[in-house]
Amino acid sequence: MKYIVVTGGVLSGIGKGIIASSTAMILKSMGLRVTSIKIDPYLNIDAGTMSPFEHGEVFVLDDGGEVDLDLGNYERFLDVNLGKDNNITTGKIYNLVIEKERKGQYLGKTVQVVPHITEEIQNWIERVAHLPVDGDKGTPDVCVIELGGTVGDIESMPFTEALRQFQFRVGVENFCLMHVSLVPVLGVVGEQKTKPSQQSIRELRSLGLSPDFCLCRSTQPLTEETKKKISLFCHVAPDNVIGVHDVSNIYRVPILLNQQNLPNLVLRRLQLNPKVDLSKTSPSESTPYWMASWKGLADRMDKITNESLNPIRIAMVGKYTGLTDAYLSVIKALDHASMAIERKMVIDWVEASNLETQNSSTAEYKKSWEMLRGAHGILVPGGFGDRGIEGMILTANYARTSGKPFLGICLGLQIAVIEYARNVMGWENANSEEFSASGSGKNVVVFMPEVSKTHMGGTMRLGSRDTIFTDVDNKISKLYNVDKVGQAVEERHRHRYEVNPEVVDEIHAKGLHFVGKDTTGVRMEIVELKDHDYYVACQFHPEFKSRPQRPSPPFIGLLNASLERLKKM
């Protein structure tokens, strides 16, 4: 087993996740089996209860793990299915150590950060690194580990020390360290400054870790002079100073790394043997054939981004629009669908509460409704709490009555049902148990009986579940290539509330058809309005399984229907 550790310096959000994912993808393209681990040095057990405004989206895995959004990048780049143990947090490690201490497993010793915490970190890494992530094809050859945060942060010190010990535990020939740093340019001088990188690597080396590679983030390509300076002062071989400047799209990052010979340098450093012929190139191109499909993705993304045709405009009506990372997987799923249909797509962000007259200024209200009316399609993503709910209900009503393509996800399905109950069924006070006071109206969405009302973390209906199609005479079944009643698709879930089973038959009879249910036949998973260009909502989160090479069917349906509407305008 070979280990590649990716650390970051100077500031957070520098791009460690994309660089780690790109490195892993390159190695996988060479025929190697690759897995990934993300270390998050916070005391939370997982990301499940963290604010989307502070942390971005919570990514959900097949096994129900609620994890950092970087694991979504790993899954999309590598096309693998990771587990919750691929995300290590300080909370998980401390919880494990304290539990062992309570059981008396330390035999009366004084339990300390070193060696007990650091030992558990190393044990966890070694155990998870050997778990298959691509079915039953075998143990991974390489594990790429991203250490979250910035080198020197007090929160990450136990992990830094554990990794220092780990390099000798597994052998230096099996351990490679990449450090991602920032090379800024001062506007007045125009010179690439290396001092932040020097200080960052000096801090890292003082902690016992010396990087094999320095990957430098910058706005423009690194000059040779800058590379030489970093090599000289940071104790990194000149060829191992890799420039990672801004590129047109993230799919260009692996290509950029390959152009600077990083794959061969990593193979040499870890004494790895690729499973493909590295000298073979794709027809009429200088790109290696093992990178050709990825280059095709990058080229396709550039093509649709730069095309002169009018783009498809999708109104994203949400609660957390102030931080787009809160919907990162939804954005990526739309991008994947956009590449698949080869048409540029633009997201218009609409804060749901601004659609409610009483909650917004006149200018915000007017602008929000203009964006909604100007869009070719509408998407209502997941969320929690009652803020903006009435705005979402107004959105669903507008989409239904205007014929505009609509996709609702998780909360979006519940919104579609509430809107239909109020305006078609005539149940004026229809609502969700999540938003309404007891006895204030007819709850068409209710709390699931098996979910805890006292504990928030890890208590929802989480992970991959089967959705059984009960009707195949509809658009969504065709998108999933389902042609027989009873066929199942597997998607990931994250919710506490469900459509009230007591109202399903009445609503279905009035035209909002429940075409997908869970394996018990009681829980509603997919609704579709038949006499509509595209009005679909699902209780699951299809965005979590969308891949660049395999776009999610509901998103393909939304963009295709929106494109048809654009053509008619």
From Swiss-Prot:
One of the GO biological process terms: 'de novo' CTP biosynthetic process
GO molecular function: ATP binding; CTP synthase activity; identical protein binding
Signal sequence segment: none
Reactions catalysed, as given in the entry: UTP + L-glutamine + ATP + H2O = CTP + L-glutamate + ADP + phosphate + 2 H(+)
Enzyme class label: ligase
PROSITE patterns membership: GATASE_TYPE_1 (PS51273)
Pfam families on file: CTP_synth_N, GATase
Associated pathway: Pyrimidine metabolism; CTP biosynthesis via de novo pathway; CTP from UDP: step 2/2
UniProt entry keywords in alphabetical sequence: ATP-binding, Glutamine amidotransferase, Ligase, Nucleotide-binding, Pyrimidine biosynthesis
UniProt superkingdom: Eukaryota
Annotated catalytic residues: 410, 541, 543
Similarity field: Belongs to the CTP synthase family.
NCBIfam families referenced in this protein's UniProt entry, alphabetically: PRK05380.1, PyrG
Annotated function: Catalyzes the ATP-dependent amination of UTP to CTP with either L-glutamine or ammonia as the source of nitrogen.
Protein name from the UniProt record: CTP synthase
Organism: Dictyostelium discoideum (Social amoeba)
